[in-house]
């Protein structure tokens, strides 16, 4: 009985560890998006300071290519919208993973109690080993 519970407990621990890895990956991804959001907001602010007489370039591979100011502003705006949507998606994913992780912790606690009871019963019943 105790061996069966121990195997089940081990499987649940592995699931919990995988959830923690997924949670860590999602947090890392969200942090990268936050950095991109900050960077793009700075670019948007800088583009807002320019007027039509200024020349704007964008980097395509190793080459700088002239770009219209309006087009550059639109591109940055679209990028900000995309990054914001991705951050919301990551936040939702993080909430789900945290909820799953909490449920997994509760399952682990129950299995640990069952295992301890089985161990105690095994120790309390001499000759059944």
UniProtKB/Swiss-Prot annotation:
Gene3D superfamilies: 1.10.287.370. Keywords: Acetylation, Chaperone, Isopeptide bond, Ubl conjugation. Signal peptide: none annotated. There is a cross-link at residue 66 (Glycyl lysine isopeptide (Lys-Gly) (interchain with G-Cter in SUMO2)). The modification N-acetylalanine is found at residue 2. There is a cross-link at residue 66 (Glycyl lysine isopeptide (Lys-Gly) (interchain with G-Cter in SUMO1)). Pfam families: Prefoldin_2 (PF01920). GO terms for biological process: chaperone-mediated protein complex assembly; negative regulation of amyloid fibril formation; protein folding. The modification N6-acetyllysine is found at residues 21, 66. Heterohexamer of two PFD-alpha type and four PFD-beta type subunits. Component of the PAQosome complex which is responsible for the biogenesis of several protein complexes and which consists of R2TP complex members RUVBL1, RUVBL2, RPAP3 and PIH1D1, URI complex members PFDN2, PFDN6, PDRG1, UXT and URI1 as well as ASDURF, POLR2E and DNAAF10/WDR92. Belongs to the prefoldin subunit beta family. Binds specifically to cytosolic chaperonin (c-CPN) and transfers target proteins to it. Binds to nascent polypeptide chain and promotes folding in an environment in which there are many competing pathways for nonnative proteins. This is Prefoldin subunit 6. It comes from Bos taurus. The lineage of its organism: Eukaryota, Metazoa, Chordata, Craniata, Vertebrata.
């Amino acid at each position: 009985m105790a061996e069966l519970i121990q195997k089940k407990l081990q499987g649940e621990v592995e699931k919990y560890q995988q959830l923690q890895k997924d949670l860590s990956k999602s947090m890392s991804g969200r942090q990268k998006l936050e950095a991109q959001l900050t960077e793009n907001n700075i670019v948007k602010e800088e583009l807002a300071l320019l007027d039509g007489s200024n020349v704007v370039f964008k980097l395509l591979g190793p080459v700088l290519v002239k770009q219209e100011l309006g087009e550059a502003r639109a591109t940055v705006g679209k990028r900000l919208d995309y990054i914001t949507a991705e951050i919301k998606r990551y936040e939702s994913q993080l909430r789900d993973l945290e909820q799953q992780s909490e449920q997994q912790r509760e399952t682990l606690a129950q299995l640990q109690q069952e295992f301890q009871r089985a161990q105690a019963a095994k120790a309390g019943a001499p000759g059944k080993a």
